[in-house]
A protein has these predicted regions:
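Short glycine-enriched loops at secondary-structure junctions
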Residues: 74-76, 99-100
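Extracytoplasmic substrate-binding proteins
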Residues: 81-164
Length: 166
């Protein structure tokens, strides 16, 4: 959600009619509280349920009469035959993939959001900044004299680094 809003800017939600609200509000309550206060429209959008929890409602999506449906790659894969009704209704499906954690897929997903929200320039700027940061980190790590590999993980990020203990 934050990616979509970051690229789309102030008008990111102007054409949004529904989203998986509960997953954001229950899985990341502090983030939800901040965003829903700053962007009150979030509270007005319909909740279409969550794919991973099995609450995603194709009927709810169809009732909203969307021009298109935006899904993460993993959501698209999990929905399987549930997508048939959406396809039969003629609703195009746009698949984004930030979860693959690759530079190319992040940039492509950002560009797609820029296209969807009429924010191509903003998307290009964000993609370039992201690419520059990733390349800077890769160069810094490559050029460092680090000797030991350490792995640390959190719920949304895996960091692999080498620590110089000498």
């Amino acid at each position: 959600y934050q990616d979509y809003m970051a690229v789309g800017g102030d008008k990111a939600l102007d054409n949004v009619v529904g989203f998986s609200k509960k997953v954001w509000s229950s899985w990341a309550p502090a983030s939800w509280e901040l965003f829903s206060k700053a962007v009150p429209k979030l509270n007005q959008l319909d909740d279409v349920g969550e794919v991973e929890e099995g609450t995603f409602s194709v009927e709810k999506v169809l009732s909203l009469k969307p021009d298109l449906l935006v899904l993460a790659d993993w959501q698209y894969e999990m929905l399987g035959s549930d997508l048939d009704a959406i396809n039969e209704a003629g609703i195009p499906i746009v698949v984004l993939d930030y979860n693959a954690q690759t530079l190319d897929k992040h940039i492509k997903s950002t560009e797609i959001i820029g296209e969807l929200t009429s924010q191509k320039d903003r998307a290009a700027k964000i993609a370039k900044e992201y690419k520059d940061i990733v390349e800077h980190i890769q160069t810094t790590v490559k050029n460092s004299k680090i000797s030991k590999t350490t792995k640390s993980s959190t719920w949304s990020l895996v960091v692999v680094a080498q620590l110089n203990k000498g």
